[in-house]
Amino acid sequence: MEKPLFPLVPLHWFGFGYTALVVSGGIVGYVKTGSVPSLAAGLLFGSLAGLGAYQLYQDPRNVWGFLAATSVTFVGVMGMRSYYYGKFMPVGLIAGASLLMAAKVGVRMLMTSD
């Protein structure tokens, strides 16, 4: 029996969950502190991640899109902010989720490279 190329849970579902986490983080940041940059960044990066997840849904081999770029960018940005502030919540949570998403997308890139 041949091993399936893709796992039981498709990557785009993780992408949609990641999108929801990023957007909700921007909204919560705005509601709690009134930070318009937090809202703008959450909506912008969440939209880009959502677009990447949608592209992945349309073509499972298309992992080089917005989802990869957004998660890798957020690992760097939120990781630096978490280190600077010395707190895990909320930026460390987003950095950790972004790291996991970047790792999952990276593994998929290695699996689909021809």
Swiss-Prot record:
Regions that span the bilayer: 8-28, 34-54, 60-80, 83-103
Disulfide bonds: none
Gene3D superfamilies in UniProt: Transmembrane protein 14-like (1.10.10.1740)
Pfam families xref list: Tmemb_14 (PF03647)
GO CC annotation: mitochondrial membrane
Domain of life according to the entry: Eukaryota
Keyword vocabulary terms for this entry: Developmental protein, Membrane, Neurogenesis, Transmembrane, Transmembrane helix
InterPro entries: TMEM14 (IPR005349), TMEM14_sf (IPR044890)
Localization in the cell: Membrane
GO biological process: cerebral cortex development; neural precursor cell proliferation; regulation of G1/S transition of mitotic cell cycle; regulation of heme biosynthetic process
Organ and tissue specificity: Mainly expressed in the outer subventricular zone (OSVZ) of the fetal brains.
Molecular-function GO terms, alphabetical: identical protein binding
Membrane topology: Multi-pass membrane protein
Function: Primate-specific protein involved in cortical expansion and folding in the developing neocortex. May drive neural progenitor proliferation through nuclear translocation of IQGAP1, which in turn promotes G1/S cell cycle transitions.
Something else known: When expressed in embryonic mouse neocortex, induces intermediate progenitor cells and outer radial glia expansion, cortical thickening and induces gyrification.
Family designation: Belongs to the TMEM14 family.
Oligomeric and partner information: Interacts with IQGAP1; this interaction promotes phosphorylation and nuclear translocation of IQGAP1.
Name of the protein this chain belongs to: Transmembrane protein 14B
